[in-house]
Amino acid sequence: MATSKTVLPDLDLAKIRRYCEGRVPTRLRDRIRIELDVRGRSVTIFECRPPSTPEIGSDWTRFPIARLRRVAARGVWMLYWRDSDLRWHLYDRVAPSPHVDPLLAEIEADPTSIFWG
C-alpha cells in the first residue's frame, strides 16, 4: 500500500531507505552519506559529501547516483543512470522488475561502474 504522500509502495520505499542507510558505515557518515529524494513515481539516490572548506558554507554536495522509477500501469520498477550532461537514461542491463531488490543489487554490484564509478 502507498502512503497518501506518494504513489509508491511503502515496502519498496523502506527497502530503498534501508539500502541507502546501510551503504555507509556509521563511523564515516560525517564524511559521506547516501540519501534519497522521492518525487512522484521516482526515487533518486544521491551520494552526499560535506564542503571541502568551511568558507564554502555548510551545505553538502549531492551527486545523483541512480534513479528508480515506478511504472504503475505495468507494475514494475525501472532503473536509470545519469550522464555527464545531467540527462537520465534507462539502464538496460537489468530488466524492469515488480520488486526493487534486483535493481538495488545491480546498483550495488555496479558491473559497468556507471553508478559508483
Question: Where are the regions that the model predicts?
Answer:
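Short, conserved beta-strand/beta-arch hydrophobic-aromatic motifs that form part
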Residues: 46-81
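Functionally constrained cores in energy, signaling, and assembly domains
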Residues: 12, 70, 106
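Negatively charged, low-complexity tracts enriched in Asp/Glu with abundant Ser/Thr
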Residues: 1-58
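Amphipathic alpha-helical interface surfaces
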Residues: 12, 64, 99-100
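Generic preference for hydrophobic/aromatic residues in regular secondary structure cores
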Residues: 36-38, 65, 88
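Short, compact, well-ordered microdomains
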Residues: 74-117
